[in-house]
Amino acid sequence: MKLFQLTLFLLVNAFLALASSESVDVESSSNETAVEEPSTIDFDVGYNILEHLDTDLSRGVEFSMQEVATFNYSFTNNEKVNVSVVGVAGSVISTPDGYQVANITEQPIGPVPIGVNETANFQAGVQLILPEGNFYMLPVLNVMKDGEPLRVGIRPLLITVNPPPLSFFNPSFLSVQILLGLLIAGATYAFITFDKSETKRKPAKNAKPVAVDQSWLPDTYKKPEKP
């Protein structure tokens, strides 16, 4: 029994010693390897939609097909150097499957210079040439910092695209109106024609009896005259 306890004690000590040596090796190797931290940018970018100023963007926005969404950007530069916004682009992602279905056409802006700790506002319109459904719009701003181009992603916007409202002069709507007009005209004509035929069939009121010449009839067939 004592031999077993002694053997177990030696095994535990050996395991602890091995673990401590491994941890020391890992520490020393991690100290020797210099890890470069990724560079960060310090911008504060927000936006609203001019066509839906009273809408809570966190809940999504509804648009009609072919409608233009005007993004009104607010850009605050918290960097230690001046920057300039030179363009806007982005992409459109379908939901919930997450496929990219369209690109936001890149369009130049300004350039809009923004100094240190300054805020600038600018606008960019996007025409929604999309099918009916739900999508995420992912705007991207093109920024110049120290002569180097940067692409700054902004929080996505959930949008719902609905069919366009039916115009009174829409060809399909006009065809429906013409069809309804023809049906109403046909029904009116049939009613007027039927009413005229019924009027012709009615006997004349207060018609006076017409005297019939019975002189040529035999006496047997003659009606006796009323006294």
Curated annotation (Swiss-Prot):
Its record classes its membrane topology as: Single-pass type I membrane protein
Q: Where is it mostly found? A: endoplasmic reticulum
Residue ranges that the UniProt entry lists as topological domain Lumenal: 22-172
Q: Where, per UniProt, does this protein localize?
A: Endoplasmic reticulum membrane
- The membrane-spanning stretches of this chain are 173-193
At the top level, the lineage of the source is Eukaryota
Supply the name of the protein: Increased recombination centers protein 22
Q: What gene is behind this protein?
A: IRC22
